[in-house]
């Protein structure tokens, strides 16, 4: 059974309105057998008191810091276990019933089926598309194998401690991505599911729990980028000049241009819409309506 790992910090009175509410709305999840929540020792009694009725497999204590939370979750599961990692501020997961209709977006209620689908397609780590904008999704398959970043808000992987554990919080997603690109030649991408989040706008959260919570935010995050670039795989796949993200008030790394990456690392694997149709021959449709 696919496990769901959620890391949270300082949001014992918010998490139920976000990720836990989203997961509880799913018709095909059994959180009592799937959900593992990682919190700090200081937060543990607050979460236990706030969430007495929430079904979960376990609540574990991890050191402060986003990377420590993820590392603790990775250590919790046995090698090879399929796990979806999620942040604590996901208020909904959106998709489109019709790939040509921007007004057909809706809240997904069958994430269990979709997680199983993703793990059937990919033995490699995979992420989800960042944007709900239909214009940027036109022409993309539901799932594909490509060179792209695995965003940190939610992603999936089979547990592999050498691949998934990192030494720093800021840029941990880029470090994992670089390792996966080096090992597998690409990562999985689920293009038509988008998590509704509010990164950096809610009190608490992983951005407040470690090396992104300092007063000198810009300087600290730029230093973290430069530290990440000391790893050979990160330096290979990412631009060497950290980029300042105005909306987030921090520095981050960007993948090298896709054309440059494709020339150096040619791709030969892609999953198209026909993948779903082949698995469901009695439902020939160009719409996702029957899928959901």
State what each model feature region is.
Residues 2-6, 23, 33-37:
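Hydrophobic targeting segments
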Residues 6-27, 43-50:
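Short, well-formed alpha-helical segments that are part of the catalytic scaffolds
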Residues 93-174, 178-179:
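Conserved catalytic core of nucleotide-sugar-dependent glycosyltransferases
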Residues 11-19, 168-169, 174-292:
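C-terminal catalytic/acceptor-binding lobe
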Residues 37, 83-87, 125-129, 187-191, ...:
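A structural signal for short, well-ordered beta-strand segments and their strand-loop junctions
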Residues 9-11, 43-44, 65, 89-91, ...:
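Short, solvent-exposed loop/turn segments at secondary-structure junctions
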Residues 38-86, 91-107:
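Active-site-proximal specificity loops/subdomain of glycosyltransferases
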């Amino acid at each position: 059974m696919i496990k769901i790992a959620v890391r949270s910090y300082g949001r014992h009175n918010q998490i139920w309105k976000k990720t836990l509410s989203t997961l509880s709305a799913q018709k095909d999840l059994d959180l009592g057998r799937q959900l593992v929540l990682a919190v700090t020792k200081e937060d543990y009694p607050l979460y236990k008191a706030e969430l007495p009725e929430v079904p979960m497999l376990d609540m574990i204590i991890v050191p402060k810091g986003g990377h420590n939370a993820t590392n603790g979750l990775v250590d919790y599961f046995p090698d090879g276990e399929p796990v979806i990692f999620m942040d604590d501020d996901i208020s909904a997961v959106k998709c489109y019933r019709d790939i040509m209709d921007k007004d057909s977006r809706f809240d997904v209620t069958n994430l269990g089926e979709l997680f199983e689908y993703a793990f059937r397609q990919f033995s490699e780590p995979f992420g989800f598309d960042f944007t709900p904008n239909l214009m940027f999704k036109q022409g993309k398959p539901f799932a594909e194998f490509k060179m792209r970043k695995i965003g940190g808000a939610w992603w999936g992987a089979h547990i592999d401690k050498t691949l998934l554990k990192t030494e720093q919080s800021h840029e941990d997603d880029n470090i994992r991505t670089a390792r996966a690109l080096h090992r597998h030649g690409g990562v999985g991408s689920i293009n038509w599911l988008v998590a509704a989040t509010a990164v950096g706008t809610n009190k608490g959260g992983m951005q407040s729990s470690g090396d992104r919570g300092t007063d000198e935010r810009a300087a600290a995050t730029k230093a973290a980028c430069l530290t990440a670039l000391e790893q050979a795989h990160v330096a290979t796949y990412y631009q060497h000049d950290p980029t300042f993200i105005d909306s987030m008030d921090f520095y981050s790394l960007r993948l090298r241009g896709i054309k440059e990456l494709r020339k150096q690392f040619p791709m030969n694997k892609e999953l198209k819409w026909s993948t779903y149709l082949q698995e469901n021959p009695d439902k020939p449709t160009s719409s996702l309506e029957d899928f959901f």
